[in-house]
Amino acid sequence: GLFDIIKNIFSGL
């Protein structure tokens, strides 16, 4: 969902 995309961004930091 949308939160998965947000977690993906944090994973890339």
Swiss-Prot record:
Cross-referenced InterPro entries: Aurein_antimicrobial_peptide (IPR013157)
Function recorded in the entry: Weak wide spectrum antimicrobial activity against Gram-positive bacteria.
Localization per Swiss-Prot or TrEMBL: Secreted
Cellular component aspect of the GO annotation: extracellular region
GO BP field: defense response to Gram-positive bacterium
Keyword Secreted listed: yes
Tissues where the protein occurs: Expressed by the skin dorsal glands.
Major localization class: secreted
UniProtKB keywords: Amphibian defense peptide, Antibiotic, Antimicrobial, Secreted
Entry superkingdom: Eukaryota
Protein name per the record: Dahlein-1.2
